[in-house]
């Protein structure tokens, strides 16, 4: 049966042992489909039904640069004092972007999750003067490509394409960082914690408290008190 006419549903697992002729068996999509879908969303290019269009071929060329990598929680991906080497497309999991002081103190700047693409936004991070680190918060499935090859492929596709692509993430990170700093200086910690619960419920469920505390700008003991106080109000 042509996939166009196949319902996009699957039968309940409890029916699978019955060998019922009405059971709908869905073919598992290859891993590369997740990569192509992710690139399609990031670049705003529709692939299905447009496979021969130049933009679709561009995505296919980009996809060839990536390989899949599965990592455990707390796997270091990029480290300070070394040029940032790769671009990452997150299929599953959460990554954190942070700086680490010589005394070991951590300052978390950003979290990235499913569907996000992570790469060295700042020119300095592509040199040995890099001060940023990237580590997995949870087990993660990633698509990884060499950053220089990735940038070169985009630049060769059209003049001005790389600056417009790069600007989107740069602006997003700058806006989120400035807003977080503004809140840190103008709002008490309980209000900032409440906004964290409202705006990032998925992070609160999946990211360890000590990392959320650093992102919120409080010490772990304060974060624990905020968490206990908020839970008491809800009960």
Predicted regions and their residues:
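Cytosolic regulatory regions built on CNB/CRP/Popeye-like sensor folds
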Residues: 1-201, 206, 210-221, 227-235
């Amino acid at each position: 049966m042509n996939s166009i006419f196949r319902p996009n549903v699957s039968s309940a697992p409890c029916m699978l042992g019955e060998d019922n002729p009405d059971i709908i068996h869905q073919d598992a999509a290859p891993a590369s489909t997740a990569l192509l879908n992710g690139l399609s969303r990031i670049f705003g290019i529709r692939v299905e039904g447009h496979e021969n269009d130049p933009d679709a071929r561009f995505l296919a060329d980009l996809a060839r640069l990536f390989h899949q990598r599965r990592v455990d929680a707390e796997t270091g991906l990029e480290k300070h004092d070394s040029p940032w080497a790769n671009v990452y497309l997150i299929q599953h999991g959460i990554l954190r972007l942070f700086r680490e002081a010589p005394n070991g103190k951590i300052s978390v700047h950003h979290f990235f999750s499913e569907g996000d693409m992570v790469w060295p936004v700042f020119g300095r991070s592509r040199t040995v003067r890099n001060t940023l680190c990237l580590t997995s918060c949870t087990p993660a499935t990633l698509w990884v490509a060499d950053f220089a090859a990735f940038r070169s492929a985009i630049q060769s596709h059209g003049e001005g394409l790389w600056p417009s692509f790069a600007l989107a993430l740069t602006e997003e990170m700058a806006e989120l960082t400035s807003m977080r700093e503004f809140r840190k200086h103008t709002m008490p910690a309980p209000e900032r914690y409440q906004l964290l619960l409202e705006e990032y419920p998925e992070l609160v469920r999946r990211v360890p408290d000590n990392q959320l505390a650093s992102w919120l700008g409080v010490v772990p003991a304060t974060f624990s008190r905020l968490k206990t106080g908020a839970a008491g109000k809800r009960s």
